[in-house]
């Protein structure tokens, strides 16, 4: 059973918002709560049919169910074997005939709840895990799916009403875009996970077509089983790969540190930028593309705030539609198992979510499974993390890594490139609107590309001997004067128009200049700037010598300055590597 409730009062919200009354802490007046409702789910267990169900009374046998959980996922035979080994069962196949389901730290075996300690499992030594894997490998070949398949068939029959309800609603939602977008102006964001798999199938059914593009963001960190599934999927769907061929994940970890829960730079560098380029290539100069995504509210706290339709915060030319946004894991698996569509075999191993296998957002269970099923890759990744911990002078690097300290890391303290975020300057003594900067990178001809968002570059109006370059607005008026010789680190900037790029004061205008100077000093070619430009004006690529080329197309740039203002201090890497500053 599902219903919208107020997260504060846990009451029903038939009007679409909470109507309960609160006392305002400041005024002492009575005010209506009006909290945005969230979806609450109640699932039951039918002891006769031996399956979880959505309705309190079983549609098949009429039995009244017992409450079991708010969400649940099936446990496949492969995970059953691993569970038996972890519980030290004599027979690793002892759960073969049982109906086994999972909800985070709880397994439900024929309706009986079994609590397990994921922390304890993940705390096992690598040698212990290696021994478990050896036993698992000998047993897994003996798995018989017969009983599992029969149990799943009963699950499907019992929950047929729920399947029809969520499927019909999602298909109708997708069909609502028929008159607003053509098939040539839309795509499915495909990750190889269960949610994008279901979303893809719903889109196919809604439009009765396999012609919709699928963009697969290859972070280079996907599970091996994801690549296998993507290959199968590509035989029946139009899949466009999106991959950053210029960057290497391990090299970037050494340069700017591993991604953390707070700053998952890997998504921007290896997914967002690559997908932006693929969209630009596939959809040319179109500025409003529809992307169907498998976002769901109950995946995480951050996603619980997403709207069903929204403008993408990362890729600005993209409208995002989420057909299954209110679905639970229960609903997703009900759809997959009912339709019989192919899915990623990583779920059979016990993964509840499939993304990057070493993601800092992965839970302890996913981390443990990677130790079991990707032992060599995990050991190598751990060595990279330990080396990083030593580099930033952690007192006990191995404990820092094993206790997950790297996942909570914030900022760039201890990382060399973070020092480039510091902008040294002082106001000019003779001109109130001028500033003298000491750059950490010598001025090159490409330096002036970063000032194109402010206007049109003219290197001929100024004193060439002094290295003066003028920036003009569209009427030909001077808005900036840049003075600095090629090869020098000294730069003088004179702001001729305090309203530069929508600035409200000289200080704000100078802040926008500093955004671009920071970008010039810190750019590693992450392509975040490309992603925020909906006009395809920004082009970034890595050159053969390892340096980065940053170009802005004068013809395409509309001087909106989104590439200047979008990220804190103008640069995504600067945002990732924030450091404590003196003073």
Regions found by a protein language model. Give the residues of each.
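A conserved regulatory-domain signal marking ACT and ACT-like small-molecule sensing domains
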Residues: 524, 538-540, 551, 555
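Long, mid-chain structured domain cores
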Residues: 134-136, 531, 536, 540
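Glycine-centered, phosphate/nucleic-acid-interacting loop/turn motifs that mediate DNA/RNA or nucleotide
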Residues: 527, 536-537, 561, 570-571
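Nucleotide-activated chemistry modules centered on ATP-dependent adenylation/adenylyltransferase
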Residues: 1-189, 194-517, 542-550, 558, ...
């Amino acid at each position: 059973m599902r219903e919208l409730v107020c997260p504060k009062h846990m009451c029903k919200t038939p009007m679409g918002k909470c109507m309960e009354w609160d006392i305002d802490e400041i005024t002492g007046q009575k005010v209506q709560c009006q909290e945005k409702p969230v979806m609450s789910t109640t699932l039951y267990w039918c002891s006769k049919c031996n399956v979880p169900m959505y309705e309190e009374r079983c549609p098949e046998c009429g039995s009244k169910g017992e409450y079991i959980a708010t969400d649940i996922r099936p446990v496949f035979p492969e995970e059953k074997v691993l569970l038996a080994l972890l519980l030290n069962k004599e027979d690793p196949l002892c759960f073969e005939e049982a109906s086994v389901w999972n909800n985070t730290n709880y397994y439900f075996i024929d309706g009986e709840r079994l609590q397990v300690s994921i922390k304890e499992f993940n705390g096992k030594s690598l040698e212990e895990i290696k021994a478990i894997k050896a036993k698992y490998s000998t047993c897994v070949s003996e798995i018989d799916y017969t009983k599992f398949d029969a149990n799943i068939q009963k699950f499907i029959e019992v929950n047929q009403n729920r399947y029809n309800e969520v499927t019909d609603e999602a298909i109708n939602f997708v069909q609502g875009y028929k008159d607003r977008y053509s098939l040539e102006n839309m795509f499915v964001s495909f990750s190889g996970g269960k949610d994008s798999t279901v979303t893809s199938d719903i889109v196919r059914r809604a439009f009765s077509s396999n012609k919709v593009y699928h963009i697969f963001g290859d972070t280079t960190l996907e599970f091996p089983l994801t690549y296998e599934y993507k290959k199968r999927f590509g035989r029946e769907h139009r899949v466009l790969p999106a991959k950053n061929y210029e960057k290497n994940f391990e090299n970037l970890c050494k340069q700017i540190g591993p991604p953390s829960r707070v700053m998952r730079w890997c998504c921007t560098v290896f997914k967002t930028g690559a997908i932006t380029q693929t969209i630009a290539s596939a959809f040319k100069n179109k500025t409003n593309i529809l992307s169907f995504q498998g976002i769901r509210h109950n995946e995480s706290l951050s996603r619980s705030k997403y709207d069903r339709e929204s403008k993408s915060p990362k890729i600005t030319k993209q409208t995002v539609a989420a057909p299954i946004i209110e679905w639970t894991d229960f609903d997703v698996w009900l759809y997959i198992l009912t339709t019989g569509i192919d899915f990623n075999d990583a779920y059979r191993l016990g993964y509840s979510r499939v993304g990057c296998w070493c993601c800092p957002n992965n839970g302890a269970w996913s981390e443990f499974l990677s130790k079991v099923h990707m032992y060599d890759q995990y050991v190598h990744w751990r060595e990279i993390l330990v080396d990083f911990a030593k580099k930033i002078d952690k007192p006990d690097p191995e404990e820092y890594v094993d206790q997950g300290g790297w996942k909570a890391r914030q900022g760039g303290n201890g990382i060399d490139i973070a020092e480039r975020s510091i902008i040294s300057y002082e106001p000019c003594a003779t001109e109130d609107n001028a500033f003298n900067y000491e750059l950490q990178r010598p001025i090159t001809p490409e330096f002036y590309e970063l000032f194109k968002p402010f206007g049109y570059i003219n290197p001929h109006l100024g004193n060439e001997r002094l290295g003066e370059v003028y920036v003009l607005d569209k009427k030909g008026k001077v808005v900036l004067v840049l003075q600095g010789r090629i090869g020098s680190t000294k730069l003088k900037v004179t702001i001729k128009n305090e309203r530069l790029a929508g600035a409200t004061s000289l200080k704000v205008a100078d802040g926008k200049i500093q955004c671009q100077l920071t970008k010039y000093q810190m750019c590693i070619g992450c392509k975040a700037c490309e992603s925020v430009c909906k006009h395809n004006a920004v082009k970034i690529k890595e050159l053969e010598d390892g340096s980065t080329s940053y170009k802005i197309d004068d013809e395409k740039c509309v001087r909106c300055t989104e590439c200047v203002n979008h990220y804190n201090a103008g640069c995504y890497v600067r945002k990732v590597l924030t450091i404590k500053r003196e003073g």
